[in-house]
């Protein structure tokens, strides 16, 4: 996977971390997410909180290979991992008691990728 065209060092590091975890654990999930982040930025997912609230259940682990935006409200207690969060999304997630973090943090906690849902 070629990440030499990425300008952001943080993004390059995130992709490399996910690829390494995928190799070590044998999980194709983290490899797929790393490939999605290595693609063009126009192809990144942009997911609103209302969509997460609509499709997720309490206790779910949701991964968004892109951006989480703060449109809508969230009433379920979920863990959300994404490349970036908007300010309003972070505020609404923390106010509702949800956990949010980088994708690599979720991958380190759950290297096999069990019970993780990708949302686009």
From Swiss-Prot:
PROSITE patterns: RIBOSOMAL_L18E. Keywords: Ribonucleoprotein, Ribosomal protein. Coiled coil: none annotated. GO terms for molecular function: RNA binding; structural constituent of ribosome. One of its GO terms (cellular component) is cytosolic large ribosomal subunit. It comes from the Archaea. Pfam families: Ribosomal_L18 (PF17135). GO terms for biological process: translation. HAMAP family: Ribosomal_eL18 (MF_00329). NCBIfam families: PRK04005.1. Belongs to the eukaryotic ribosomal protein eL18 family. This is Large ribosomal subunit protein eL18. It comes from Thermoplasma acidophilum (strain ATCC 25905 / DSM 1728 / JCM 9062 / NBRC 15155 / AMRC-C165). The lineage of its organism: Archaea, Methanobacteriati, Thermoplasmatota, Thermoplasmata, Thermoplasmatales. The gene is rpl18e.
